[in-house]
Each structure stands twice: as C-alpha cells, then as structure tokens.
Amino acid sequence: MRSHYCTDLSSNDIGKKVQLCGWVNSYRDHGGVIFIDLRDRTGIIQLVCDPKDSKSAHEIGSKVRDEYVLKATGTIRARGEGLINPKLKTGEIEVIVDELYIENESAALPFVIGDPNVGEDIRLKYRFLDLRNTESFDKFKLRSKASIACRNALDRLGFLEVETPILTRATPEGARDYLVPSRVYPGSFYALPQSPQLFKQLLMCAGFDKYFQIARCFRDEDLRADRQPEFTQIDVEMSFCTQEDVIKVGEEILKDIFYACGHDIITPFRRMEYKDAMETYGNDKPDLRFDLPMVDVIDIFAKSNNEIFSTPAQNIKKNRAKAIKVPGGDNIFSKRQMQRFEEFVRKFGAKGLAFIQVKEDGLKGPLVKFFEQEQIDELIKRCELKVGDVVFFGIGDKKTVLDYMGRFRAFLANELGIIDENKLEFLWVVNFPMFEQNDDGSYSAMHHPFTMPNNPDEEDLEDITSIAYDVVLNGVELGGGSIRIHKNDIQQKVFKLLKIDEAEQREKFGFLLDALSFGAPPHGGFAIGLDRLIMLVTKSASIRDVIAFPKTQRASCPMTKAPSNVSNEQLRELGLRLKGKETK
C-alpha cells in the first residue's frame, strides 16, 4: 500500500511520486487549502490538499479528523520560502496530494497522543494509543536492535539458542513463584520460572557446552520502578570456564549491544570487591559517575571522649563509623539544606547526622569538642580536608550505617548536580558473600544455592565467599552470575548449611543432584536484564516505558483487566474452590 515511510523522504526526492500511509497527527484549513500532518512509525510529513491540484482529495481532506487512518498519493515538492519547519526531519518538503483515501475513522481520543502530562493509569488503559508515537517506537526499535546484536554476538561466539520450559516446578530462588494449577493432576501446581537457572545447568550436564536464551521470567514480588512480574533476561551458560572466561563473554556481548544502541563502550570494565563496594560506597552497585567516597573513621571515633561515639566504635565487627567529605560544601549548603540532609538519613534508620565544617580558623561543629587535637589532625589528614569543606559522619550498626550513608552519598550527588547523565560507568563487583543473614537469624544464599563457594570448609558462614559477580551500570545492577557447583557432594553440603535436609533435597532438587552425579563439567554463566538495560540506554523514567504491555506497580493490566475472575466451572475442572468467594 505504501511506497515509503514518511521520514524516508527528503529534498533529494523532490518531484517523485509517492504513496504514503499513516495517521492524522493534526490538520488545518488555511484559505481553502487543507494541510494534514501525516504520521507513521518513523515521524511526520505534511500533506497538502489543494482543490487546484485535486478536488476529490480536497473534499476527502475536509472530512479528516485526528487519528483517522489515511492513504495518500502525491508528488514531493519543496516548501515555499519561510515555510520550512526545522523541527521536522521532513520540514523542507511536503506532498501535493492528488489521491486521498480514508482507510478508517477514529473515535474521540481519551487523551492527546504524545501528551507527557497524561497519567500513567489512563496511558496503560489505552496502551495501544500510548505507543502510537515516534518516541515510543524509537525505544522499541532500539530494543529490537539490542536483541539482534545480542543474538549475533552469541552466535559468533559459538553459543546455541535453546528454549527451556515455562511450565516447571516450584524451587526456592528468593521470590514467590507464580503457580499454575494442573487439570490433569488435581491439587498439583506448575510454577512459572523465575529464571532458567537449573535447566541451563542441566544443558551443561548434557554436553551442550554453550547455551543462551532471551528468556521470559516471572516473579511474584513487590514492584518498584525497575521491576515487573514478568520480565526478559539475556541468559547465558558455558562449560569448562573460569570467572574470567564468563566475564569476557559478558563484556563482549554488552559491547556489541551498546554499539548497536549508539554507544562505543570501553572494555574491560573496572573491577571491585564486594567488601570494598560496601565499605566505600554503602552498597554493592555503586554509581561511579561521581566521587564522594565513604572514609572509615571508626578508630578515630573509638578515641572520642563521648561514649555515644566511643562505645559503638569499640566493636568493629558489628559497627561502623563513616565520613563523607563534600569539597567546598561549607560554601554551598544552607542551614535548611543541612536540616533536610538529617531528615533524609533519619528515614533510613539514622539517629542523626553529625558534621564538621572546615573554616579558616579551624574545624567547627558540635562534634569537635568530643575529640582531642590528635584525633582532629587525623580526621583532617584521612579525609583530606581543606578550608570550605564539610564532612558528614554516620556511626552505629554496620548494616544501618552503610545503608543510609550510601543512600546519602547518592542524595548529595543529586543535590550538587554532579552526576553526568551522558556518562556510562560499568563495573564488575566480585567475591560476594555466599550467605546472608535474615532478620530471624537464619541464613539464605545471597545469589542462589547453586553458586560455587570459594571456601566451603569455613566454619563461620559469614566468612564464606562465592565465585559470583554482578555487572553494574551507573548504580544499577544490569545482571550477574556465578561459577556453579558441579560436584554432588559440594552441592549437598551447601544445602545442608542452608538447613535443607536430605529428604527435602531429593524432593526439590533430586534431578539436579542426579545430573551432578553423572560427570557434570565445571560451568558458569550470567543473566542480564534486557528491560532494565533498555531503560537505562533510553533514559526512561520507568521500566514500564520499554515493555510493550507492562503491568502497573500493583501487578495489574488496566487494558485487559488482568488478573481476572474465572468461572466456577473452570475452577472445578482444576479441582479448586475459592474460600469465601463464588464466581459466576
């Protein structure tokens, strides 16, 4: 039906006969001549319906309204002097229409296409209209390019694309499973996969050597700006590899993906130990586009003459004292800002926010009187303080201090406006703890229980590290992976450390333990969140902007009204009955 997309045309095509299809973006009648902005997925071009050129086209053009679907045939001509629109890619040309056909009409719109002020609920209810603009199309075009680049890179490296089951069994992977009742086996349930983790390990046991999949995954968890109940990840696994081998593949894939998206990134990426990331930046996914590191000052606080500071500083295993210096901050921050800073950290468990200002005549602030000159001199030296600086302090429980000071670091960077939004700072965080302690004192796997520990014979679980690695971009975790356990005895030992007894091991993971018993090769891999990656590349405010039909933050779809009720007959077929609720 069409000869060109709208923005395929330029001044080089003047005099060419074309046939275009699209939607009416806007229309206007100027002195009997009708001008229509025709929009397709690439952009906009101006149609001119002049009765001098075609009475029939002018007559039909007088009937069009916003979002009518048109087919237009005409000739490209240059716009007149002073009529060029520099805001349009096709702003130097227009189409003199000799034939116009209305393919379809449109009802009154619930909102103006492309209006940034429309609420998200109404946008998602009419998602098919919300997507009907070039900005949205460009994001999905970029997503498509990224997927193609990923597949091409992995194919070049010898990986096989293999699809793994969507209907599987429930396994503990950190979040709640979505369950699907079985009609054939009443009372039994499938689970939608949180990841293809176990299946890709089984493919390594099968000798496939190199696997990948752009996989759909499902997690029934509380949602945030960068989370969805169903999401897509680039899933990779390889045999006979080391951590270095896997990281090299990950970097090569990311380099190709970002090149396809218009960015030439430098490899290899920086590396940082998990412990260093936590102690210096307060989290395991630091944003390295700005500085503001945390400095350890617990030994200085241990010598304070105030027990509020000295007592917690005596226990360096459980507590922390951290300082963040802001160069020139004393000349930047107002009293009101300083109050806001304290209000901010209190939201995350801080009891307050101590600070010291560096003046011409020395250090000032409520903390100074609690230290001798020797400690003051050490603070100046360690924090590299200069006149005009301000340094903030956090002291107390290790987990709490690292959390709120890490958050405060990012908050300060935003307040100071020092984050370069066009910068891409990649980082590998390595050597994660194998286990983390829960609020009830029990332990769980930090990544998952199939990760190879570095030192499985260590008695203290908190001292066991794993061969695990995360890739971080601008303070956001893009993905991660690990070298896997490939020996049955080590896997059983890890299960035992997690208080999973032999009966439960056989019940939930018998197929994996069997596979590890028949000559499983050393293997490892990683997964990268494709949705999150595209969100960052396109600078979208939410992951929902780069998913064609996303769920809301309450895991619902306003457009299809999912999740929905089902009939009693459907429930009976599945052997189910809802407590206290009957449906028709």
Swiss-Prot record:
It comes from the Bacteria. Its EC number is 6.1.1.23. The record marks 30, 82 as: Important for tRNA non-discrimination. InterPro entries: Aa-tRNA-synt_II, aa-tRNA-synth_II, aa-tRNA-synth_II/BPL/LPL, Asp-tRNA-ligase_1, Asp-tRNA-ligase_1_N, Asp/Asn-tRNA-synth_IIb, AspRS_core, GAD-like_sf. Keywords: Aminoacyl-tRNA synthetase, ATP-binding, Cytoplasm, Ligase, Nucleotide-binding, Protein biosynthesis. It is an enzyme of class 6 (ligase). It is found in: Cytoplasm. GO terms for biological process: aspartyl-tRNA aminoacylation. L-aspartate binds at residues 173, 219, 447, 484. ATP binds at residues 219-221, 228, 477, 529-532. Residues 197-200 are annotated as: Aspartate. GO terms for cellular component: cytoplasm. It catalyses: tRNA(Asx) + L-aspartate + ATP = L-aspartyl-tRNA(Asx) + AMP + diphosphate. Belongs to the class-II aminoacyl-tRNA synthetase family. Type 1 subfamily. Homodimer. HAMAP family: Asp_tRNA_synth_type1. PANTHER family: ASPARTATE--TRNA LIGASE, MITOCHONDRIAL, ASPARTYL/LYSYL-TRNA SYNTHETASE. This is Aspartate--tRNA(Asp/Asn) ligase. It comes from Campylobacter fetus subsp. fetus (strain 82-40). The gene is aspS.
